[in-house]
Amino acid sequence: MKTVQRPLWFVLVAVLALLWNLFGLFSFYVHFTASPEVIASWPEAQRQIEAATPRWIFVPFAVATIGGVLGSLGLLLGRRWAEPVLLLSLLAILVQFGSIYAITPTWALTGIGGAILPLCIGLFGLFLWWYAGKAASRGWLR
């Protein structure tokens, strides 16, 4: 399949996606390496959520963030494998946040306001997967 010239806005979206996902990877690092002293400095609600969160939640968190970075890098490089990697990232986002809301007191402690960021993360993950599919169908990925 012949690769078609990608428009500038495609590259801009890919760069923004990479930056967004690098921020997510940093968030993963901060949560994964947080010492008891750091956790003690967090607001009470966040400490309760952290205490109730099982360690296995870090597996989908890692898959979501690393997959997001790799998928965004794949988009930037114009690689077709970006689409399935971004799908894997999206699925991991759904598992991560679905599990957190199912087994921790997140909803009770943060209410609707606490759901805004996870919702935005999920929607952006969905957008990136869709965007990669459109880019592949237009011949922008090889």
Give the predicted meaning of each segment.
Residues 1-142:
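Topology signature of small-to-medium multi-pass alpha-helical membrane proteins
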